[in-house]
Amino acid sequence: MADRLIVRGAREHNLKNVSLDLPRDSLIVFTGLSGSGKSSLAFDTIFAEGQRRYVESLSSYARQFLGQMDKPDVDFIEGLSPAVSIDQKSTSRNPRSTVGTITEVYDYLRLLFARIGKPHCPECGRPISRQSPQAIVDKVLELPEGSRFQVLSPLVRERKGEFVDLFADLQTKGYSRARVDGETVQLSNPPTLKKQEKHTIEVVVDRLTVKDSAKRRLTDSVETALGLSGGMVVLDFVDLPEDDPERERMYSEHLYCPYDDLSFEELEPRSFSFNSPFGACPDCSGIGTRMEVDAELIVPDEDKSLDEGAIHPWSHGHTKDYFGRLIGALADALGFRTDIPFAGLPLRARKALLYGHKTQVEVRYRNRYGRERRYTTAFEGAIPFVKRRHSEAESDASRERFEGYMREVPCPTCQGTRLKPLVLAVTVMGKSIAEVSAMSISDCADFLGELTLNARDKKIAERVLKEVNERLRFLVDVGLDYLSLNRAAGTLSGGEAQRIRLATQIGSGLVGVLYVLDEPSIGLHQRDNHRLIETLVRLRDMGNTLIVVEHDEDTIKVADWIVDIGPGAGEHGGKVVHSGSVKELLDNAESQTGLYLSGRKAIPLPDIRRPQDPSRRLTVHGARENNLQDIDVSFPLGVFTAVTGVSGSGKSTLVNDILYTHLARELNGARNVPGRHTRVDGDDLVDKVVHVDQSPIGRTPRSNPATYTGVFDHIRKLFAETTEAKVRGYLPGRFSFNVKGGRCENCAGDGTIKIEMNFLPDVYVPCEVCHGARYNRETLEVHYKGKSIADVLNMPIEEATDFFEAVPAISRHMKTLKDVGLGYVRLGQSATTLSGGEAQRVKLASELQRRSTGRTVYVLDEPTTGLHFEDISKLLTVLGGLVDKGNTVIVIEHNLDVIKTADWVVDMGPEGGAGGGLVVAEGTPEQVAGVPASHTGKFLRDVLGADRVSDAAPVTRPRKAAKTVAAKAAAKKTATKTVTGTAAKKATATRTAKTAVKKAAKPAAKKTTRTSKA
């Protein structure tokens, strides 16, 4: 097999006739500025061709079902393996998706429980089982020889009636005896039963003695009894005393509980699926949650008194006085005060206020003429009131208002397990499938590893357990051991979702495959990075080729081969600047990546941190959503704050689910319900909140930077204001390519026409009428400063910034797009061709161009996703500009370059999942670096340098920590001849990344030296 992957003449997107030779069975990292062409080469050329060739090998019939792959614009590629891609797609937001279903572990667990699970009765908890007639006979013949018994067929169990016809029918069939309510009777003289009482009737099929010669007769009798009763037989051992539990033995062909008279259908794997009607809880249809009124949202702040409006739905609007009088009447009736905090009220009073009061209360009030009036009325209670008004609401606005007091709570029927009671009563080693799914992945792996099974079950479960354990092991390896299998996919952070997909793909254990990965380190803390790198290295050692598009320093240093694409982005990129080893990259003066890695260029440390005003802060009190452990956290206003911590420590929950959602609700009137917390102080000091998250922008070909940021509306208005447009009577709508009027109708404003080729890829050709301009001839005759609307859409943003300089509404948008580093992107460039990093910056620009008031809070979730060192530098300049105007920027981030430039750091942890949810450290980066318990602090110490840490932290412990680092550095100095003294600190930090260390020590050293000097 070829030992190289050869690419010749790649011209996809902005690639400029790129030719490359890559080693196979290696870890290859593609790096370069955002938008330089890394993804175009890795995904749109190499992966697309590998995938297309595999699909081409199938029959034309199969191909038409598979979605066609476009042939990339490349001359040829040699040495290509079947390709698997793991890209930056957002996770499924489907409420039915869980970690277990995405990773397919749950599918194997369903199979395991269906085949070796022990069913129990959901009512009484006794084991239930089924037996064939032969198995029943074999069990009976194992009993002591000579035991006498009678074979009974239960026909009626605890049912009302006289059953005259049944007795007559049995007699005609030749049966002579029956047992009615425990008494044996002759059918020739049947008893007269009371119609209104419940009766049990069993017909005596045969009377036998245990001996081998009776085997055939016993089998016939058992089969007859099973046939009569529909699958049940009772054996009554007459020699045993009446009260002996062994006297009667009941056997069933089906799953049946004789004690509760419940019979159950066969257990199949689908019975354990909450996405199937056979297994889903009938009340919540397998979702596991229901919308219920939450008392915490009714009384958000228990420190307020009733007079101050503690009961939120009753403290607003024109009904405020009415409810005030009603509460006063209840206070008189129950004898409590309304001027003390709600938390201090007696339990009886709080219960009555929330859930209602049985007896009527007397309300007294003065009407507008000053006369006192009184009436008696029922006191409904705040929770029933919200429930009733929500169900009676006729308008969406009214319904949404009351939904603001409701929260998703676990379904009361299934307790949030999503499954039917019978399914939950099936156990393996005493645990139900719901209990196994609720364990953390590491506990689940231990539980399945310690299963003790009998020989039969072992043989059945062997293969299933092997598959499950493989998948679980891999999830543990990529640092997701704290997640549980029943965790909803929608609640995962970006990094968790990405690594779950990685685990799913790599768990298959294929060899000789080309894996193309897009930034697998997103959302991963430096502490966990080495585990991911070890996984990638192990995957390579199995005999696979890995192409990783990555900006992470550690990953770049471990790579066998680096391809740096650039030198700039967009039209200024698309060339291979470097293809070779890390060492050669560091010496390459043209490569931006090389300049940063070697330390010749660095993101500087700020000389001083912006001062904080203790009176101006946002403080979240009592945060306890997800894994947060009732914490109070402060965010100083007017500074740049970074929220850090290992993956799954509760950063997104605190910032996105609680702080941002609360501010959006208070300031923007949003309807979303914030996560559980007591209150937020300081929200009166800000007047606007803006959020930029990781979700992609609209991925339709009609969406582009101009339409997404809203600047296109201003451009269309400007064209409609030109003399020519006014003469022709054109309105702004004439200049839209999405509506009839000004667009070319041949291609409906797309500029291209899709030609369907059935089982070959669809071909897109430029429209022969407008030649790709999207507009009709008349519209294109309108010019502004000599350019038509199509010319403007085709302009790079940096050119458009100068072109529209005189129009403030447009130039503001253009300047922001240019500032975030998108000057090379064309205004009308389709959103589908933007890289992940570019799409996020378009989103950022559309938020940043809004006029800042100086009292705005910007919340950004991992803004460095997909960004190169150079791009991060530009981003920090933009964010710094916002803070200098008095605004507040809060970022959730793992990137040390961003954290070291922050004014304030809130470090969450100490671990992920149940081991997190606390604030480990808060303060300036220097102070956090001095906290031994902080994982982030440990890595910050190496970036900042020991001298800065000791200066900033007034506590003794940080000084001690700093001394230790300095001592280690000194010790290393003697051993390292080629590198300067401070270099060794980086080597100490990277020691954790076991595989990384050997290749990385020297380059790492250089970088740190320069950074600390800067």
From Swiss-Prot:
GO molecular function, one term: zinc ion binding
Positions with biased composition (Low complexity): 976-995
Pfam families: ABC_tran (PF00005), UvrA_DNA-bind (PF17755), UvrA_inter (PF17760)
Subcellular location(s) per record: Cytoplasm
Top-level taxon of the source organism: Bacteria
Keyword Zinc-finger recorded: yes
Binding annotation for ATP: 32-39, 645-652
Listed GO CC annotations: cytoplasm; excinuclease repair complex
Gene3D superfamilies reported for this sequence: ABC transporter ATPase domain-like (1.10.8.280), ABC transporter ATPase like domain (1.20.1580.10), ATP-grasp fold, A domain (3.30.1490.20), P-loop containing nucleotide triphosphate hydrolases (3.40.50.300)
InterPro entries from the UniProt entry: ABC_transporter-like_ATP-bd (IPR003439), ABC_transporter-like_CS (IPR017871), ATP_grasp_subdomain_1 (IPR013815), P-loop_NTPase (IPR027417), UvrA (IPR004602), UvrA_DNA-bd (IPR041552), UvrA_inter (IPR041102)
C4-type zinc finger segments: 744-770
Region (Disordered), start-end ranges: 976-1014
Domain ABC transporter stretches: 314-592, 612-941
GO biological process, one term: SOS response
Basic residues bias (residue ranges): 996-1014
Subunit: Forms a heterotetramer with UvrB during the search for lesions.
Protein name: UvrABC system protein A
UniProt organism field: Streptomyces coelicolor (strain ATCC BAA-471 / A3(2) / M145)
